[in-house]
């Protein structure tokens, strides 16, 4: 029986990418800086199960250093690598598409102006078609600060809050009760169509509740309106070949529901874990279970909260054995990330980083993966390896790491003297 489980720790980078300087991210290191922050506070980061799968070894490949305050295990239970991205952006669709074997090699559209960010013609069309009294925001912003600033004005005026960031994104925040959730979704669908000529990757509905800046809170009813991948992903190929793809969390939205057989919605990491375990119980032969753990990014990366990020990682690590216990002998488990979001970095945007690839099962020996002592060429090696695992035709990008021979019995030993 052939199954695969792909867990995406959204934004969990492990050191700046080779081209990070072009993005203003030279020196970014989500894992390394979280570990440093915790070590400096006398509470070393504790991720024993991720460590046993090769997390710290992957970080060592990416940076040449061991994360501060950790002791890498001398023996491992998984294969590991550090993967770099060739897609043009450092956003969620680019990372996920490339993970699925389809890198975004084109340039996304962006709204670079920090204020008055959107073209007047676009906003006028949105206001007219959606019959709005106007809009608020029209700027670069992070989600909670803009609610604290404009939430009360939104409730009083009925004008939705529109904003963007360094990503290719158009976000709309509106109150679930005062504006209406269905109305927000309908507004986002209008915006999605209007934004097609601008080549914007995502429109995101950001519903919230509360009555004052102190009580405003975003809800779990977020919805992403993405464009379709330009060519079939490994998800689409598996689906078209008679297999099944169970997308947990926002996976369906990220891929514009292309190739996703069933969508299992859940909000919060514990609920996402529960849904993943239920999906594994349901998954039969030739099934891919794919989950995005989004809170690392939205709650801790963008909000520059290294303590919260560390605690979320430790909570994830504590639950990881529940997934491991459900694996069958031929299952392939892969843990990775779609980009970085260093919570100690300047600003509030993603960071261009390498990501871990931690793989277990399917006959993989504990070792570095890939072609250069563990460094994968692209995120797309994951998609290519999944294609091989499921017996699909090859992807146009990436190399299969399942067939690479081990580099020797000592290849996964730790060298703590580095």
Curated annotation (Swiss-Prot):
Known catalytic reactions: 2-deoxy-alpha-D-ribose 1-phosphate = 2-deoxy-D-ribose 5-phosphate; alpha-D-ribose 1-phosphate = D-ribose 5-phosphate
Chief subcellular location: cytoplasm
Protein name, per record: Phosphopentomutase
Matching Pfam families: Metalloenzyme
Compartments, as annotated in UniProt: Cytoplasm
Involved pathway(s): Carbohydrate degradation; 2-deoxy-D-ribose 1-phosphate degradation; D-glyceraldehyde 3-phosphate and acetaldehyde from 2-deoxy-alpha-D-ribose 1-phosphate: step 1/2
Binding site for Mn(2+) 1: 10, 338-339
GO biological process: 2-deoxyribose 1-phosphate catabolic process; 5-phosphoribose 1-diphosphate biosynthetic process; metabolic compound salvage; nucleotide metabolic process
Cofactor annotation comment: Binds 2 manganese ions.
Lineage: Bacteria, Pseudomonadati, Pseudomonadota, Gammaproteobacteria, Oceanospirillales
InterPro entries xrefs: Alkaline_phosphatase_core_sf, DeoB, Metalloenzyme, Phosphopentomutase_DeoB_cap_sf
Similarity comment: family membership: Belongs to the phosphopentomutase family.
Binding-site positions, Mn(2+) 2: 297, 302, 350
Gene transcribed to yield this protein: deoB
């Amino acid at each position: 029986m052939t199954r695969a489980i792909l867990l995406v720790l959204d934004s969990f980078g492990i050191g700046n990418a080779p081209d990070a300087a072009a993005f203003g991210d030279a020196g970014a290191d989500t894992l390394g800086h979280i570990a440093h922050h915790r070590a400096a506070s006398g509470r070393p980061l504790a991720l024993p199960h991720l460590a046993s799968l090769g997390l710290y070894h992957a970080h060592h490949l990416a940076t040449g250093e061991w994360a501060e305050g950790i002791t890498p295990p001398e023996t491992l239970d998984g294969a590991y690598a550090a993967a770099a991205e060739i897609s043009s952006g450092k956003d969620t669709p680019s990372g996920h598409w490339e993970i699925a074997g389809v890198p975004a090699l084109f340039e996304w559209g962006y709204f670079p102006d920090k204020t008055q960010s959107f073209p007047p013609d676009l906003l006028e069309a949105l206001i007219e078609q959606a019959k709005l009294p106007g809009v608020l925001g029209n700027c670069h912003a992070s989600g909670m600060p803009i609610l604290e600033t404009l939430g009360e004005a939104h409730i009083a005026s009925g004008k939705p809050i529109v904003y963007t960031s360094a990503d290719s994104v158009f976000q709309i925040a509106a109150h679930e009760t005062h504006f209406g959730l269905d109305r927000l979704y309908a507004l986002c669908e209008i915006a999605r169509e209007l934004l097609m000529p601008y080549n914007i990757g995502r429109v995101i509905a950001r519903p919230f509740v509360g009555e004052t800046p102190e009580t405003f809170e975003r809800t779990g009813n977020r919805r992403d309106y993405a464009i379709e991948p330009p060519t079939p992903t490994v998800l689409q190929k598996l689906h078209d070949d008679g297999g099944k793809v169970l997308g947990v969390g926002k996976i369906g939205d990220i891929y514009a529901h292309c190739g996703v057989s069933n969508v299992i919605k859940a909000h919060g990491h514990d609920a996402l874990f529960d849904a993943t375990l239920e999906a594994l119980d349901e998954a039969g032969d030739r099934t891919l279970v794919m989950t995005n753990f989004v809170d690392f990014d939205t709650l801790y990366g963008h909000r520059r909260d290294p303590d919260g990020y560390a605690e979320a990682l430790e909570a994830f690590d504590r639950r990881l054995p529940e997934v491991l216990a459900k694996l069958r002998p031929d299952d392939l488990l892969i843990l990775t990330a779609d980009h970085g979001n260093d919570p100690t970095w300047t600003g509030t945007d993603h960071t261009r980083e390498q990501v871990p690839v931690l793989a277990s099962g399917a006959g993989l020996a504990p070792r570095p993966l890939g072609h250069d002592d563990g460094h994968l060429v692209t995120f797309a090696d994951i998609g290519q390896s999944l294609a091989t695992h499921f017996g699909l035709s090859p992807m146009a990008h990436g190399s299969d790491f399942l067939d690479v021979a081990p580099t020797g019995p000592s290849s996964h030993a730790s060298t703590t003297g580095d």
